[in-house]
Amino acid sequence: FSTAFDRVAYSVTGSAHPSEMYAAELGEVGDRKLTGFNDPVLAEVELPTAERILYPSDDGTQVEGWVLVPPGYDPAAGPYPLILSIHGGPHGAYGNSFAFEQQLYAAAGHVVVYTNPRGSTGYGEAFLWAIWGGWGTLDGQDVLAGVDHVVANWAIDEERMGVTGYSYGGF
């Protein structure tokens, strides 16, 4: 907020655009883009937008995730290789924000799935602590159910699937 508390500046991101700064006047409709750090690069590349998915895990628990397909994705041209990306934590979470790594994989022709299994933040205390004392159990089921969901709904080559992760996601 400004010192007069009538303006706010904030960062905006999405799966197909890195963060930029915006400002808005309180009580007004609309906002104003303050930065364009990424505009020159974005004018030269095609970045796909991730699709949000909700799918049931083995026990029926609803899990949120995102699927990012290669630019120009055409199911008839598939099947495509798949990469499962697992976040750190376990008390971390993916969101609808720009992820260079996922965009890089998609640009190389892979479908990328990244999910928020049990243990992730943002879904309540029960979801967060469901894996306490059991890392790699329910959360493992959740990410594998996400892979099954993507294989069933996108043109995926089941002989070319891989997994990547960092910190807890590499566990």
Where are the regions a protein language model picked out?
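Serine-hydrolase catalytic core recognition
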Residues: 1-171
